[in-house]
Amino acid sequence: MVSFGVDFAVHSIRRYQEEKSNNITFDKKFIIAFGGVGSALTLAFISDAIAFLSNITAGIESVVHFGLAAGVAAFASYIVLGIYAPFILSKIESIDNNNNKNKFLWTIEAIGSAGLSGGSVIVFLLVSPLIGIIMILTNLLMFLLLPIYLASRSKKNIEKEEKINNKNIFVKFEEMFSNIIIFIAKKPYLTILVFALITAYSTFLALKLEARFEVADFFNEESEFVVGLDKLDYHFGDTTGEIGVIYIKGDLSNPLAIEDMKKLIENLDSKEFLAHDKMGELLLIEPNLMSLINQTNISGNNKKENQETFENLINQGLINENNEEFYSSNRIKFTLIKEGDEFSTVFRVGIPDSANQKVTTLARNELEKELEFLNNKTYISDFGITGSPFVRDIELSSATSSLYKSIPIAAFASFIVLLITFRSIKYALVTVIPIGLVVSWLYGIMFIGGYSLNLVTATIGAISIGVGIDFSIHITQRFREEIRKNSYDIALQKTLNGTGIALLGSALSSIVGFSIMGFAPMPMFSSFGQITAIMIFLALISSVFVLPSLLVIVSKK
């Protein structure tokens, strides 16, 4: 969110810098600059919020919380970095408008402020909120209020700002980038054809992307957890596995219910995806109701006897012939409990290689089919499967489903907002089109890179819409502003020289931020950082290469 927030600051401050050559007061420069870029920033904030909040349809608590928190953070970034930061900058420059004075001192103060700000956030979250707040207040005092006070005391009246004529390497790079995007924008039909072919191929690849859970995608392969799982698979293989749970509730003392449970166990014995012991028998974690019935030496054909036996097991545990406690009552209650006039029981089975999501999905589907014959039994009131592998499988399915829901919702809502704001279908449409390209390119690259859809990467689709629409809005809004008073050639040139370069700066800052996350030791965070950095780069390409070509075509018409 810090990386995204910088985008607001880059655009507003860049527009303010464009007005610095005008011989007017600093306050008027800020008003003119924000008057030009303010509507674009507001639209960008709204579209960002829509994209993030679309994740609340996911049905997964962590993803919903992510969407809500990101929406709040987008609003905070808009206020603090989009409005407050350039306003403070204009005030500081109005006090100390000699740009060549104390360059070294201002550089030291900037570095100190940035370092203390970053450190205060880390300390606030990980060490102590009180110490973090003290660091923030110290930062404001030392690097904002004190410099302003000192600058105001030594203020000099300078009528005209000195213009720096020397071009550093950054200015030269900006000019080269500007020339490239203007050259491409002047060949709109060829540009659109090339990117349309790229999009068609990337869409083909994106549709082949699969949702899966791999432990290696979430945890460091050298961590004790992953090493332990590898050793478990190596030494025990198909004789154990992650535990899946079959739940059955009803009048289980009924002999027919006992026969049905025996039939279920017999059917499961033939399932190769379930763990079997060295003798080839189905592995059922002890104690279970079938083994308890065998150990108590009851036939299971007498309902009253069954009920009394079950109640004794729950209250007293399993006592052997020598009057020794074999299973305590507490242990029995992990397998068998009484709820009113009904009993509930669970059968725990092993699922080998459950880290492979295809295996887990197969197990879930097959077990659900095997339980279907209990549907019409009057003595069975409830049944189902649960356990960590199946919960995880459902979460992944929900994540994939949320991806298919959140992307259309975010795109449609953004289009409606743009349509109302621009009051033009063609400008709203061409602003949204590049976003679809970004999503297609992103998931196509994910397929090529061997990534998969999981609880983390599924959210990036909606984020890509938020970032992409943000970039597109700035280009379209600036172009509409310039086209009112210039020809489309001049409007395009001013848009790309001004807003296009600002997009380059904001994109680079975000790419750097997420690329750093790509070095995280946990693959979950590392892949998120890498994919998001790629997504921001694609959003930049789409906004400065594809969108200008579309704007040229619709403006000519």
Residue positions per predicted region:
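N-terminal start-of-chain detector that recognizes signal peptides
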Residues: S62, I164, V171, V215-E221, ...
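Hydrophobic alpha-helical transmembrane segments in integral membrane proteins
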Residues: S202-D230
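Membrane-embedded transmembrane helical bundles of large multi-pass transporters/channels
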Residues: M1-F213, A355-N365, K369-K557
